[in-house]
Amino acid sequence: MDLENNTIHCSTFVQHTYIKLNPVGPIGAGRLPETRSVEEAQQYPTGWKFWLTILTMSALVVLGGLDTNIVATAVPSHASTRTPSPAASPLSPPATQRSSALTNRLTSVLSASYADSDIRDALETLSLRDIHNTPEVRRQLRLDVQKEVVDCNAEIVRDFGKVAEQLKRIGTVITSLNQTCDEMRKHISLARQDTAPVLEEASTLMNQKKEAETKQQLLDAFTKHFVVPDDDILVLTSLEDPINDQFFEVLARVKQVHRDCEALLGGENQRLGLELMDKSSRNLNSAYQKLYRWIQKEFKSLNLEDPRISSSIRRALRVLAERPSLFHSCLDFFAEARDYTLSDAFHYALTDAVSGTAGDSNVKPIEFSAHDPLRYIGDMLAWVHSTTVSEREALEALFVADGEELARGIQAGLSSEPWSRIDEHEEVAFDGQKALSDLVNRDLIGVSRALRQRVELVIQGHDDPVTCYKVVGLLSFYRTTFQKLLGPNSNLAELLVTLEKFTFGHFEALMKDVVSSLSTDHLALTPSEDLSTPQFLIDALEGLTSLMKTYEASFGADDTESTSDENRFTPVLRAAFDPFLELATSSAEELSNATARAIYLTNIHLTARTSVSEYSFVSTTHLNPISTKLSSLRIDLLEIQHRYLLDESGLQVLLTALEPFSPSSVAKSSTETEKQDSHPLESQPQQQPNLADIATLPAFQPEALIAVSQQLDDFLPSALMDATDNLKRLRSAAFVKSVTEEAVEAFCRDFEFVEGMIIGADEARGKVDVTRVDRGSETGAESEKGMEEGENGWGLRRLFPRTTGEIRVLLS
């Protein structure tokens, strides 16, 4: 075992020594890398391995762990042909066994890794000793190392001896310290026993001190929060002290105390909370009463025209809103004061004198224009409007500028005064604009009363319908203005609605009076000789035109609700147009001549249509009835002209004679025949009129027919002029022309019918009536005799030579 250990240590030592001191082999095999193991080094030349083996064996010999004979046997010669010596000791093991053991040992040594850090450190230490690789050094190396180890151990022992001496001294010191500590413990124990009662008493006193301090802090906090100083209470309730910022600060603090008292009522002992709440309630009531009186005093001297209204008044009103009863009472007082002030100002503007004081000489009183109702009423309404706007702006700055604050104050007041609610479940929301409008309405009650009296007096004393209607338009304009300014339910808006109805009623009464007086004036209702429009209707239409212009200027562009049946101007037409038109129409009954009556009515309706057609808001309701009436009158005039042409030309005689032969008469006869009871045995065949019979009619006898033809020839040259002159009293030339042209066209159609009958009669006279011949009656014989006379005698066409073309040319 020792040999094995020595071999391992020697091989390690040799390997490190070789690498460190002899990097190049004796035969130049090359440098062995320091990090290579023996297995890795086997790839180098054989010389390197040989020298490594020699060094290993030498080390073993030096260390005494291996016999030199074994080394000689184990190490091969440098030449490959060298063989081991056959000589062997008889007492030694066989050479083969020794060689095998050594080989195994060397193999294990050489197979070990020489890159171990311990081996490198050992070789490094060996290299630092500055020794030489000699046999002597190699033999003494172990001894030297052991000697150094022994020396080092001896030095360590000496050092530990010194340490032991120091430890003894330290132990002595520690023992002394322990004795001292024991004595101190005894003294401390005795002192603790003596001071324990004192400490307990001191701890008790400290706890009591803390409790007292806590109670003092609570008392201070309670006093600071719940107790109001007497000086502050005096500021809050004394009538001599002014209303200033300090008053509102104290009031806010007292209200906070009153609210916080509810927390004190939540405990078992409620006496303190009840007392504080009762005291704060009394103080608050006194403060609100003081504030209420102060606001009333300020309202008496308040000038709303001053743009710098005191901010303290606005603040006081916001605070007073928390007491709804006092707040509304204050508003009532303010409304009464403003009502008196504005009524006085309105009277001053009307008369320029209030309580004997003279007015401004540069401004004339409104009543100076009382003779002109329109201007007088307009000036009063303008003053009221200006005053309303100024009042609203001033009150808006006073009340509505802080509308949210007022709303919160009123809500808080309703909570404190639940009896102020009408319905306990209603939710009250403060509407600043509505409240402002209501207050302005109350301020203007006296002004509204005076305005109504004066307007009614002026209207009742005026008789001009046009002026009355202009006043209606003026009132309607201001009604719309005040509805936008104060709301549709305001007093002023309702007053103007009433005045508007009153004025329009007076207008209707005036128009009824005019119509009533005309209906009894026989001279005015008598148609003129020229059948022109009566003068009273012309005057009425002129007044109506003024009314329509007034309406158009005021409401025409905004009248978007008008329909074909009704609009805002329709009542005016019913009062100022329809009665006069009916009166003029009824006056035509005095004319016995139908032509004159038709012309007179046409002139009336043409004039009326001209007046109403210029304005859309009138034409939509009244133009259609007038146009319908004119269409009916036009038909009558057309019939008159047609009859005039037939009578003057003599053609009416021929048409009357030919009436049985007209298509309408034949159709009528056929219809009456079909209505009769028809049986095959009883019915007779319907006989068509024979055109040949026309020549037998009296009107178609030669003398009569020649007279008609001559009358026609005399009429035709001036027929158109005569027909136009027949309607010369009609005021519309275009109307006369259109009616005459249609009458001429009807006359031409009638002449064409007569001409056709004459030609047909002449043609029929050249034929035999088969039905009469078959019956063999005397009529058939007479017809044959007449035909013979027609062939040798006169013809209808020759006696009446005019043609339809000639007639159209002459009448064109």
UniProtKB/Swiss-Prot annotation:
Residues 77-96 have a biased composition (Low complexity). InterPro entries: COG6 (IPR010490), COG6_C (IPR048369), COG6_N (IPR048368). GO terms for biological process: intra-Golgi vesicle-mediated transport; protein transport. It is a peripheral membrane protein. The keyword Membrane applies. Residues 77-100, 665-688 are annotated as: Disordered. Disulfide bonds: none annotated. Residues 671-680 have a biased composition (Basic and acidic residues). GO terms for cellular component: Golgi membrane; Golgi transport complex. Keywords: Golgi apparatus, Membrane, Protein transport, Transport. It is found in: Golgi apparatus membrane. SMART domains: COG6. The keyword Membrane applies. Acts as a component of the peripheral membrane COG complex that is involved in intra-Golgi protein trafficking. COG is located at the cis-Golgi, and regulates tethering of retrograde intra-Golgi vesicles and possibly a number of other membrane trafficking events. Belongs to the COG6 family. PANTHER family: COMPONENT OF OLIGOMERIC GOLGI COMPLEX 6, CONSERVED OLIGOMERIC GOLGI COMPLEX SUBUNIT 6. This is Conserved oligomeric Golgi complex subunit 6.
